[in-house]
Amino acid sequence: MRWNDDAVVPAKVSPDLEFLFRQGERLILEAVAAREEEYILDVGCGRAVDAALLSESGAVVIGLEPSEVMLSRAKEHLGAVSAPVALSRGVGESLPFRSNSFDKVICKGALDHFLSPDKTMAEISRVLKPGGEAIIAIANMESLAFHIGRGTFKLRAIFSPKADRGAKPWELPPDHTCKFDYRSISTLVKSYFQVKKAEGISLLYGMPGWGNILSLLPRPVRCGILALLDKAARPFPSLADVIVVKCALFSWRK
């Protein structure tokens, strides 16, 4: 597999997307709350940016990635920041690790790329130690912004048939195998885990014209607006741009 992330970040990054990336990284690392000597697995680690940051806690971190290209980029990044992260090639549906091996497993922005998210969740459950935690972060394809976007473009199509027909943020990217919203990710997770907390990150990313409006505002003003929207998104994951679910193994599992 030679998938790469070249198309993930657009050539021009809007203020709302920049904020989403930055805030997402910070809050997900907080959710993991890595501790010294914990064993942590990052499934679909990409460039291993999060894995490198997690290793700063003293945790033993392993990054799993199916793509040869991304593994190469991960090695470059880890070398550049001198992070002691081990890398392994493999897929989420068949994790190459023994059962009860990890204290925590993180899967950020990768579950919707897998052929079988259900098998992946089963495997994450298998490799976690009793009392272990899984932290799942996924793009919400039914966010408030995407609902507004779909409605806006339907109206545009009625009154302006020649309206822009390019790719839209609320359309499923070609490298995704499925789409998630709050209901579907909750249903999937609850098949294998007890949900400890579900939160939203960011609000209104991808709403038509929103990035352009923010670009016109002074930086302190737009940062304040984005921070307020992010705070508003936290208790409403069904409306947020990204959903983060922190969960634990069922207490009866030995």
Task: Identify the function of each model-found stretch.
Residues M1-R35, E37-G46, V49-L53, M70-R73, I135-K162:
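Conserved class I S-adenosyl-L-methionine
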Residues I106:
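A conserved beta-strand element that flanks and buttresses the S-adenosyl-L-methionine
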Residues D118-P130:
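A short glycine-rich, Lys/Arg-flanked "PGG" loop and its adjoining helix->strand segment in the class I
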Residues A167-S184:
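Acceptor-substrate binding/catalytic loop of class I
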Residues R183, T187, K197-K254:
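A C-terminal cap/extension of S-adenosyl-L-methionine-dependent methyltransferases
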